[in-house]
Amino acid sequence: MITSQQMRAARALLGIDQRELAALAGVSLPTIQRMEASDGQVRGVVDTLMKVIAALEGAGIELIGENAQSTGTGRGIRLRTAVSD
C-alpha cells in the first residue's frame, strides 16, 4: 500500500510535519510516528492507512507503485535500485 519512506518523502514534498499530516488524515500524532518508524510497508488498520493515503493524495501527492507508470502530469522523482558498475 504505502511505505514509511513514501510517507516521509510525501511530507517533505508538501513541506508539512507529522503533526500536520495527522491533522489532515484525522488520526493521532503517535499513529503517524509509528507508521513512519516502521520498516518498509506500513502495517496497521486498513481504515487508518486509507485515511493517510487519502490525505496525501488530497494534498496533491501521487503515490506510484513499484514498476507502475505515473498517470499524473508535471515533473517528479522516483527512487530506483542503483546500477552496478
What is the predicted function of each stretch?
Residues 10, 24, 35:
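Residues in the recognition helix of alpha-helical DNA-binding motifs
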Residues 6, 31-34, 76:
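Residue-level recognition of specific faces of alpha-helices
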Residues 46-63:
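DNA major-groove recognition helix of helix-turn-helix/homeodomain DNA-binding modules
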Residues 7-20, 81-82:
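Short basic helix-loop element that most often maps to the first helix and adjoining turn
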Residues 1-2:
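A detector for short, charged/polar N-terminal pre-domain segments
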Residues 58-85:
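Short, charged recognition helix plus adjacent turn
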Residues 24, 45, 69:
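Residue-level "edge-of-site" marker
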Residues 27-44:
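Recognition helix of helix-turn-helix/homeodomain-like DNA-binding domains
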